[in-house]
UniProtKB/Swiss-Prot annotation:
Function in brief: Catalyzes the phosphorylation of riboflavin (vitamin B2) to form flavin-mononucleotide (FMN).
UniProt-annotated location(s): Cytoplasm
Alphabetical UniProt keywords: ATP-binding, Cytoplasm, Flavoprotein, FMN, Kinase, Magnesium, Metal-binding, Nucleotide-binding, Transferase, Zinc
Gene3D superfamilies registered for this protein in UniProt: Riboflavin kinase-like
Active site: 80
Record: residues binding Mg(2+): 28, 30
Pfam family, one: Flavokinase
GO molecular function: ATP binding; metal ion binding; riboflavin kinase activity
Enzyme Commission number(s) of this protein: 2.7.1.26
EC class: transferase
Superkingdom per UniProt: Eukaryota
InterPro entries (alphabetical): Riboflavin_kinase (IPR023468), Riboflavin_kinase_bac/euk (IPR015865), Riboflavin_kinase_dom_sf (IPR023465)
Protein name: Putative riboflavin kinase
Organism encoding this protein: Drosophila melanogaster (Fruit fly)
Length: 153
């Protein structure tokens, strides 16, 4: 249900399948399964946009995928975040915080890798425009991005 947006989540960045950078040219930061499972089950799978930061650093625009990535026939649900910023290092082990602001489209399979890449590039362009709107831009300043995450044990 999209009425739950904006939605905040955070956790350690873990290794994914390695497809984002290598196959797609669109690197992603991936959450561990426990963070994925902590998201509301009623949240539709698909592409979203919002804000993200790493280790309480600067907040950047982002797009993310929530789901099973039908093009790749994933067996487990994943959350893969692509920040619209070039990082010059691996982010594994660092803390990723996200604010999911809006929904772009449902997940689906694609006929080719090229059509998947084109769809993601379109998502990125839409996200840039939406996040420039004042009501969405203000979420970049949410205290969540500078607060320490508490782990539940």
């Amino acid at each position: 249900m999209l009425s739950q947006l904006p939605l905040f989540a955070g956790g350690e960045i873990v290794r994914g399948f390695g497809r984002g950078s290598k196959e797609l040219g669109i690197p992603t930061a991936n959450f561990p399964l426990e963070v994925v499972k902590s998201l509301p089950e009623s949240l539709p799978t698909g592409a979203y946009y919002g804000w993200a930061n790493v280790d309480n650093g600067p907040v950047h625009k982002m797009v993310l995928s929530i789901g099973w990535n039908p093009f790749y026939n994933n067996k487990e649900k994943s959350v893969e975040t692509h920040m619209l910023h070039d990082f010059n290092c691996d982010l594994y082990g660092q803390t990723l915080k996200i604010c999911i602001v809006g929904y772009l489209r449902p997940e689906r399979s694609f006929d080719s890798l090229e059509s998947l890449i084109a769809a993601i590039r379109g998502d990125i362009e839409q996200a840039k425009a939406f996040l420039d709107e004042a009501d969405k831009a203000k979420l970049k300043e949410a205290p969540f991005f500078t607060e320490k995450l508490c782990s539940s044990k």
